[in-house]
Amino acid sequence: MQRNMLKSKIHRVAVTHCELHYEGSCAIDEDLLEAANIVENERIDIWNINNGERFSTYAIKGERGSGMISLNGSAARRAQLGDLVIIAAFAVVDEAELKAGWKPDLVFVDDNNKIKGSRDHVPTQNWT
């Protein structure tokens, strides 16, 4: 059996640019791409925390160290500057890979979209 699993996530990153007339895509700071194991032209899902929009596009490289998250083309209509988004990518994983310990790459950022931490799992949600 094969499963479609979360592969990569950049959590609560702020939109820094919206370029309506740029060729469609999402430019992401190269440091963030590498940390999250997302490659250029890979399909990504973007979930806007501020307005609930959910959409797909593809990743392109943004200037390394800049904190850039640029929504381009029609994606620019889905967010405003400063909106917090989650960027995710998925992979098809077989049972053997899962049993061998396959884990996702989760990246967390500060208020300037700089990496503040990473981990390989989402913690169990508990009632408080």
UniProtKB/Swiss-Prot annotation:
- Processing after translation: Is synthesized initially as an inactive proenzyme, which is activated by self-cleavage at a specific serine bond to produce a beta-subunit with a hydroxyl group at its C-terminus and an alpha-subunit with a pyruvoyl group at its N-terminus.
List the keywords (alphabetical): Autocatalytic cleavage, Cytoplasm, Decarboxylase, Lyase, Pantothenate biosynthesis, Pyruvate, Schiff base, Zymogen
GO cellular component annotations of the record:
cytosol
- Listed as disulfide-bonded, the cysteine pairs are none
Q: What's the superkingdom here?
A: Bacteria
Active-site residue list:
S25, Y58
Query: Which EC numbers does the record give?
Result: 4.1.1.11
- If you read the UniProt record, what top EC class would you report for this enzyme, in one word? lyase
Give the metabolic or biological pathway: Cofactor biosynthesis; (R)-pantothenate biosynthesis; beta-alanine from L-aspartate: step 1/1
Where are the Pyruvic acid (Ser) residues found in this chain?
A: S25
Instruction: Give a Pfam family name.
Output: Asp_decarbox
Concerning SUPFAM superfamilies, the annotation shows: ADC-like
What remark does the entry make about the cofactor? Answer: Binds 1 pyruvoyl group covalently per subunit.
Q: What is its main location?
A: cytoplasm
Q: Single GO molecular-function term?
A: aspartate 1-decarboxylase activity
Subunit structure, interactors included: Heterooctamer of four alpha and four beta subunits.
Main function: Catalyzes the pyruvoyl-dependent decarboxylation of aspartate to produce beta-alanine.
Protein family per UniProt: Belongs to the PanD family.
Give the protein's recorded name. Answer: Aspartate 1-decarboxylase
Species in which this protein is naturally found: Paraburkholderia phytofirmans (strain DSM 17436 / LMG 22146 / PsJN) (Burkholderia phytofirmans)
Gene encoding this chain? panD
